[in-house]
């Protein structure tokens, strides 16, 4: 499984891509492979505030329903609407087509506290 080096990772298997004062958030390849076939994704609305380490949505697979935990705090400025019609994108393209939300950061230092690709690989035994 590939773990992109340009992203940061949470212990709950979300990835974060920094774009200026905003971040894009999704779930990792490891997470989607553990969940199995994704059949539904529930995400917050644009304008919602999310708090680090708190649930902000959920992913339903044929195996289970898993909550999504916010790796950072901020305001949701965009939601990937394609996932409501094509939840399988999470399995097919977890790092590109299946981004979940874009968030305007309330504290940019939170990103630095997330795991590097190397640390995430160690945590998931993917090194």
From Swiss-Prot:
The modification N6-lipoyllysine is found at residue 63. It holds the Pfam family GCV_H. Keywords: Lipoyl. It comes from the Bacteria. GO terms for biological process: glycine decarboxylation via glycine cleavage system. Binds 1 lipoyl cofactor covalently. InterPro entries: 2-oxoA_DH_lipoyl-BS, Biotin_lipoyl, GCV_H, GCV_H/Fam206, GCV_H_sub, Single_hybrid_motif. The keyword DNA-binding does not apply. Residues 22-104 form the Lipoyl-binding domain. Its cofactor is (R)-lipoate. One of its GO terms (cellular component) is cytosol. Gene3D superfamilies: 2.40.50.100. The keyword Disulfide bond does not apply. The glycine cleavage system is composed of four proteins: P, T, L and H. Belongs to the GcvH family. NCBIfam families: gcvH, PRK01202.1. The glycine cleavage system catalyzes the degradation of glycine. The H protein shuttles the methylamine group of glycine from the P protein to the T protein. Is also involved in protein lipoylation via its role as an octanoyl/lipoyl carrier protein intermediate. This is Glycine cleavage system H protein.
